[in-house]
């Protein structure tokens, strides 16, 4: 599984980072970005998909 963050939609609320710090972190501009090429198997169902579903601006997409 792969995920992306649309930087144009990200409002830096931090929800994804709080939910899934093994996949998301802050970038130099204070926005969320993906820090892994592939979501680790254990994180797919537990936090990555939850981050996709909980993002208030739908900036996170599963690809």
UniProtKB/Swiss-Prot annotation:
One of its GO terms (molecular function) is electron transfer activity. Keywords: 4Fe-4S, Electron transport, Iron, Iron-sulfur, Metal-binding, Transport. Signal peptide: none annotated. Binds 1 [4Fe-4S] cluster. The keyword Ubl conjugation does not apply. Residues 2-29 form the 4Fe-4S ferredoxin-type domain. InterPro entries: 3Fe4S_ferredoxin, 4Fe4S_Fe-S-bd, 4Fe4S_Fe_S_CS, Fe-S_cluster_ET. PROSITE patterns: 4FE4S_FER_1 (PS00198), 4FE4S_FER_2 (PS51379). This is Ferredoxin. It comes from Moorella thermoacetica.
């Amino acid at each position: 599984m792969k995920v992306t963050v649309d930087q144009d939609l990200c409002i830096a609320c931090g929800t994804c980072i709080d939910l899934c710090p093994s996949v998301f972190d802050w970038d130099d501009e204070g926005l969320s970005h993906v820090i892994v090429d592939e979501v680790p198997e254990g994180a797919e169902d537990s936090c990555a998909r939850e981050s996709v579903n909980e993002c208030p601006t739908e900036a996170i997409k599963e690809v």
